Amino acid sequence: MPMLLSKNRECLDQSNEVEKFKSNIFKWAEKLDVEPKEIHLRSMKNKWASLSQNGRLTFNTKLLEIERELCDYVIVHELLHMKVPNHGKLFKSLMFAFLPDWEKYSERLKVDR
């Protein structure tokens, strides 16, 4: 019986983390003036996140385990793609406007892979 309680608590803790994560996405979406159509979390081997052409955002479940500022970087990066589809000058200037240290976070995520 204690094992079952432990698993339930783990599920509850993970559920709370997912809700906090999604809440953070909506906070950033409001700041960036974008409206994600769908948000999903799943295990991904080679990506931190992706945005489909129809506005579906998918985030790697590993984001639930890393530092908040790195998470914010991934969230802002993907949400900005709803406004700017490429990584050109406009995209980079918006990244700097919302996350001045975004390049540092990007490098840290590459190293952590």
Question: PLM features: residue spans?
Answer:
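Active-site-proximal or metal-binding-adjacent scaffold patches in catalytic folds
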Residues: 1-73, 82-113
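Walker B catalytic acidic pair
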Residues: 78
